[in-house]
Amino acid sequence: MEHNKDTTVAETSATQWHPAFFGSLQIEFEKEADKLIFESEHQLSTKPMAIDVLIIKKISNEPIKKNIGRIFRKHNIIEYKSPDDYLSIDDFYKVYGYACFYKYDISITNEIKITDLTISFVCEGYPRKLIRHLETTKKYKISKHGNGIYYVEGDIIPIHII
């Protein structure tokens, strides 16, 4: 049975569990507290989160013929970098995080399947540092699928760089 996230939060909001858990972690690490920094309810962003472009396919299994859209599934997240900007390693993780948050930020648990997402990065030049990072650190394979289209293979979410 799928759970409605709003109902679940409302039902459990009477008891504030996070402060107790935070305190118990501080006690648990008491002997090594000088090596650690503890932050409760750390805010992840100072700016509002926004996906540059979201394309939702009306019919999930209908293939897209255009070369830059062949990778598309139901929910397609696109990050655009202007000609005077570059696609960095941190941009990759930011957009990947947005994809995960987009999947999460709905009322019904798992309504958007992880296998229904894609991520596309559109940038002016070839992002060498990012590609090197993806290949060496993430162990992804990068393959060319047309003029200026590179698939990033090895993740559950299909990713490509244009």
What function would you assign to each model-found segment?
Residues 1-162:
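Conserved single-residue anchors adjacent to enzymatic active/cofactor-binding motifs
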